[in-house]
């Protein structure tokens, strides 16, 4: 029947998940369905589900604030942690992509930051990707009738100011007690074992030394961030008075073929593998794994280099390493500083709307990028890698070796646009593309080629026996 055929406008209208639509109807709460748009607009309500031995607590706070569990404890007197298992069960059962700030949806007491009700209207997650609910203040106040209000969120403006001040004055970053302890520990001997899958392949290659080639060893090492970094470091530090190392080690292949040799690399790798392999950082189901993100970024860095004009291309081996190691500080935290890593992981889970650098600097006085860069310096890695790690989130960086930092910024955000990675998405400025000699179309083509090789990349990560 013609009158039942939906119009084009109706087909394009965003739809709410049934459980949210029915809940709003039963509550008699009028809302406006809007598409998610970056930039200004009503404040967004963040919802965090927490728990302790006494039970669960739903916490609602503005999106321009950070939820600090220690500060929250001073308000509620409870040692709360993310209720990740229950959150995931709730989202999966209701087929929601995110937790809406609707207290009636969850069988748990609710605490909200009073500053939410200072705004004329608010935005709530709908549970449908990129679809939000705009709700007037008085309507939302009625939904919070049984909840308790308090002030506990930390304004991001203050956190950004502190981070920018320390970025402008690098020595400030090591003045805090925690940051100072981290740097002092990194200045002692640090060894990070390879992944378990890498260890299995190392044993296989070592058991067949005559049959394995330099390419076999290089291909394996280049899939493991920790092992790749340490192999390049060994090569750079391997010189003696009688046998100096090459002036520059520019890639994993350089380190293996020109300096160390496959047998030495496998022997040293076996020694490293006696330590406990690092667990994948932050193994939340809805996040791309650390290992995948590292390999995707490295592979895309290689593709972007090839797409650049010949005269402006950086060293491809160093560009690949910059991508592979771009998040190396996070892996270092996980392996060397487990208590700090646990604290950080909890706060990243409940503050997914905030760039990780703000969370890390607030909690530790230092960011993962600074930690990774410190370790690059201590291992005497090429300066380009230190710059790439430190400058990767600054789209305006144009200092020494800027091409590496700019390429990492580009690669990470191209991947994030396609749903790979777990950091808040940032705009890619046209000027950055211009300075790299790239167009957005050529950059996207490089990304398409990487994603087309997804099966091959997953095989590399799996390293099947």
Annotate each language-model stretch with its function.
Residues 33-42, 218-221, 427-433:
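Short secondary-structure junction/hinge motifs that connect adjacent elements
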Residues 153-345, 353-426, 464:
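Conserved alpha-helical "signature site"
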Residues 68, 381-383, 439:
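Helix N-cap / loop-to-helix initiation motif
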């Amino acid at each position: 029947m013609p009158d039942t055929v939906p119009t084009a406008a109706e087909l394009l209208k965003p739809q709410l998940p049934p459980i949210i639509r029915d809940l709003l109807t039963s509550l008699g709460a009028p809302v406006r369905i809007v598409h998610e748009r970056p930039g200004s607009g009503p404040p967004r309500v963040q919802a965090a589900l927490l728990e302790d031995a006494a039970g669960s607590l739903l916490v609602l706070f503005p999106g321009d604030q950070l939820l600090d569990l220690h500060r929250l404890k001073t308000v509620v007197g409870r040692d709360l942690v993310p209720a990740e298992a229950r959150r995931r069960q709730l989202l999966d059962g209701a087929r929601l992509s995110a937790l809406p700030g609707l207290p009636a949806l969850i069988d748990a007491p609710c605490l909200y930051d009073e500053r939410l009700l200072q705004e004329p209207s608010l935005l709530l997650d709908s549970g449908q990707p990129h679809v939000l609910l705009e709700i007037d203040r008085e309507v939302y106040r009625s939904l919070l009738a049984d909840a308790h209000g308090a002030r506990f969120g930390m304004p991001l403006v203050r956190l950004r100011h502190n981070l920018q001040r320390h970025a402008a004055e690098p020595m400030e970053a090591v003045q805090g007690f925690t940051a100072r302890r981290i740097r002092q520990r990194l200045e002692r001997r640090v060894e990070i074992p390879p992944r378990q899958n890498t260890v299995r392949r190392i044993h296989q290659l070592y058991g067949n030394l005559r049959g394995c080639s330099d390419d076999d060893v290089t291909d394996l090492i280049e899939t493991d961030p920790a092992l790749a970094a340490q192999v390049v470091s060994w090569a750079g530090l391997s010189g003696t008075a009688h046998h100096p190392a090459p002036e520059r080690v520019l890639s994993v292949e350089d380190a293996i073929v020109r300096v160390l040799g496959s047998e030495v690399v496998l022997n040293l790798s076996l020694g490293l593998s006696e330590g406990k392999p690092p667990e994948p950082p932050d193994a939340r189901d809805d996040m791309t794994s650390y290992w995948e993100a590292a390999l995707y970024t490295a592979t895309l860095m290689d593709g972007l280099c090839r797409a650049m004009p010949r005269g402006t291309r950086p060293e491809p081996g160093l560009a690949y390493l910059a991508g592979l190691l771009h998040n190396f500080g996070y892996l270092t935290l996980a392996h060397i500083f487990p208590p700090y890593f646990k604290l950080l992981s909890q706060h990243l889970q409940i503050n997914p709307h905030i760039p990780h650098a703000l969370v890390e600097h607030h909690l530790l006085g230092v960011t993962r990028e600074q930690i990774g860069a410190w370790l690059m310096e201590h291992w005497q890695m090429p300066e380009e890698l230190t710059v790439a790690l430190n400058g990767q989130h600054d789209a305006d960086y144009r200092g020494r070796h800027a091409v590496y930092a700019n390429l990492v910024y580009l690669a990470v955000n191209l991947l994030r646009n396609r749903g790979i990675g777990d950091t808040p998405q940032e705009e890619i400025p046209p000027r950055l593309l211009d300075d790299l000699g790239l167009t957005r179309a050529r950059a996207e083509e490089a990304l398409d080629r990487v994603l087309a090789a997804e099966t091959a990349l997953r095989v590399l990560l799996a390293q099947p026996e």
